[in-house]
Amino acid sequence: MITPAFELSQDADFLIVVIRVPYTRTSDFDIYIQEEEFKFYAKPYFLRLTLPGRIVEDGREKASFDIDKGLFTLHVPKETAGQHFEGLEMLTSLLAPKGSRSAKPLVEDSEACGEGCEEEDEEFDWQIEQEVYTEAPADTLKEYHKYGFGNLRSGVFSRLQEELNEVIDMKDPDNTNAELRRRNRLDTETAVFCADHYLVNLYEDKEEIRNLLKFKPWWRKLNPDPSAGYDISMTFTEEEREQMRRFTNRSYLLDKKARFHVWLGLVDIILAYVYDVRTTEGEHNVESAWTIRKLSGTLSWLETYHSVQDVLVSFGRRTYCYPLYRHFSLVTLAVKDAACIFQAGKACILKCLLAIHKIFRENDPAYILNDLYITDYCIWIQRVKSKHVLALAEPLNNAKLQKNHLELELEIIEQAAELAVKEEEEKDTESDTDDSSSSSGDSDDEDDSDEECPEKAAEKKQTAFKAHAEAVTEAFCVELQRGDGRLIEELGKRLEEELTIEEDVPQERRSASEGEGERRREHYHPHAAESERDTTKAATGKELLDVCLQRKPLRILNTEELDSDDDDDDDDDGDLRITVVDERG
């Protein structure tokens, strides 16, 4: 027989059952309704449900069949109109037979069954008084070497040594008692804690942390009413419903202490899950399986807790040691998120557990944690009382977790960091002051240099001018040493006079001096030019176009370029030959 896919919903008067039976004959089906039991048969499908409320067959039943979709819809009257049936989303629990509500118990104990059922109805005192740990005798240590859901497993890791190191953080759990696991966990957390990573998140990643804190996960949109006293109705996807149908019904015979550990382990796992959802902003990634099992001491160290405060401290410490974002605001907000989920009821918790189950199922070898914890939690949570789930929301909402509870010296580290920041700021301030003083001194020096600059420039110019004049005069003397003495004297005087005029006249008065020099040249031209022409002609025997140095360029030719006769004449007479070229023609 095939168990068909189905969904349950309700209104004030009817229980609505939708069954998917695509391969059946619509004219051949049977329905059985009696008190809490509902049965449906249409070959080859068979469905049996044990309901949380009583139904009745009184003629108001309605049925319809959608041939295209293969959906069979039944409206079954409630015995008490207006009654709310809890847990209609818990498909695994509904499939269990009446009475045992289990296909095959995980642990059978016929004598303790009735007692166990009564204990499940007892109220939990979450402020239970803690007992001081005492070392157990050696002959009783074996009972502590268990782990898994309700400490019902042992010997699992002895068969899975290769996968051990990749799944949990401890070695040889089968031979390690609970107290030693805890000590080793605390020592490891203290050793791997990185103050630098924490300070980077605290001071440099403020924007990223702020965005994560603003993110609103799906459970924040539920707005559960604390006074309602029942679960919020949740919608499960087809994949989630299919996974619930695959679970095998089991009976968990747990004593009061074991059930207490199971509830605290559930809080620990949910905290790790909500942290991953927030830090990935609802988009689980390839690191999600690692993050969830690392943040949960239950999953990574097979830890068993003794109070809600123990769970919160462990979660806070591991949040500061392993994930990418390590910030106290993320820890406190994760606690509020977990409280919101427990306030919404067991259907909301089941949805979270199914998400974790899927993440681990798709990650090798994290699937081992499904076998040890998550699958059992998914089955167990469907059958617990809603009041126990809602009761856990209160201690989470009222939790007072502080940094000093984590025993990682966070406050000392922050104080040291603040002092370092202040010292750095003081150094920067002193450096800025020195820079401004230096800039002020440099500015004064520049002002003084700007005032002295014109005088120095004038002195340099005069010195260069004198050197140039002396060089030109010397060059003329060397070239004209064999020339007419009178011509040399006149040329030297004229050049000296012109250079003197250029030296004495300031830069801003050059235009006036140039005009005066032009007038002098005009005055000199009628007489001196004629005298120079006659003298040169007498010495060289050649007519010169113009010898006025103020108007025409003077070119002194090398005597080696002259004729040999001229050289002889020069040797005999000592006359100078000068050629003046008129560049106008």
Swiss-Prot record:
An example Gene Ontology molecular-function term: unfolded protein binding
A Pfam family of this chain: SHQ1
Record-annotated CS domain positions: 1-89
Keyword presence, Nucleus: yes
Keyword terms of this UniProt record: Cytoplasm, Nucleus, Phosphoprotein
Sequence segments annotated as region (Disordered): 421-461, 495-541, 556-585
InterPro entries: CS_dom, HSP20-like_chaperone, Shq1, SHQ1-like_CS, Shq1_C
Location relative to the cell: Cytoplasm, Cytosol; Nucleus, Nucleoplasm
One GO BP: box H/ACA snoRNP assembly
Modified residues (Phosphothreonine): T536, T540
Role of this protein: Required for the quantitative accumulation of H/ACA ribonucleoproteins (RNPs).
Name listed for the protein in its UniProt record: Protein SHQ1 homolog
Organism: Danio rerio (Zebrafish)
